Amino acid sequence: MAGSVADSDAVVKLDDGHLNNSLSSPVQADVYFPRLIVPFCGHIKGGMRPGKKVLVMGIVDLNPESFAISLTCGDSEDPPADVAIELKAVFTDRQLLRNSCISGERGEEQSAIPYFPFIPDQPFRVEILCEHPRFRVFVDGHQLFDFYHRIQTLSAIDTIKINGDLQITKLG
């Protein structure tokens, strides 16, 4: 898995299996940057900790049904890795669902949001900020909700998985 995902002008690289990025210049929707393959699975170097932020920028597909962004404890499929937080955008219901899955048991799903922030064929920016008691989730710079930690060992949350009806343009 070592090597560069894209050429030297790329923003995101996978080196030695670790997700790294360059935040030296602002990203605009009309600037070219390589598409990352969906479904995507990447390692979060050092795992999560208070103050650490995960950034996902992308473009929603033209006719989307749903997409999901998950932070997990590893990438195991059998047994499945614990899911610290899964964000699932469901376009038919205009919902942004949140949940966790620990030892195969799904937690209580949360769905309340002030508005549905995603628009088909439009870019978006999701930031997941890890704080001591919770994740704070922002979309396009606006805080949408808090999700209180259900996994207490934050450093074990070391993988990001993205799938569904979107194109990823930047990860950080």
Curated annotation (Swiss-Prot):
<keyword id="KW-0597">Phosphoprotein</keyword>
<protein>
    <recommendedName>
        <fullName>Galectin-related protein</fullName>
    </recommendedName>
</protein>
<feature type="domain" description="Galectin">
    <location>
        <begin position="39"/>
        <end position="168"/>
    </location>
</feature>
<keyword id="KW-0007">Acetylation</keyword>
<dbReference type="Pfam" id="PF00337">
    <property type="entry name" value="Gal-bind_lectin"/>
</dbReference>
<dbReference type="InterPro" id="IPR013320">
    <property type="entry name" value="ConA-like_dom_sf"/>
</dbReference>
<comment type="function">
    <text>Does not bind lactose, and may not bind carbohydrates.</text>
</comment>
<comment type="subunit">
    <text>Monomer.</text>
</comment>
<feature type="modified residue" description="Phosphoserine">
    <location>
        <position position="22"/>
    </location>
</feature>
<dbReference type="InterPro" id="IPR044156">
    <property type="entry name" value="Galectin-like"/>
</dbReference>
<dbReference type="GO" id="GO:0030246">
    <property type="term" value="F:carbohydrate binding"/>
</dbReference>
<dbReference type="InterPro" id="IPR001079">
    <property type="entry name" value="Galectin_CRD"/>
</dbReference>
<feature type="modified residue" description="Phosphoserine">
    <location>
        <position position="25"/>
    </location>
</feature>
<feature type="modified residue" description="N-acetylalanine">
    <location>
        <position position="2"/>
    </location>
</feature>
<keyword id="KW-0430">Lectin</keyword>
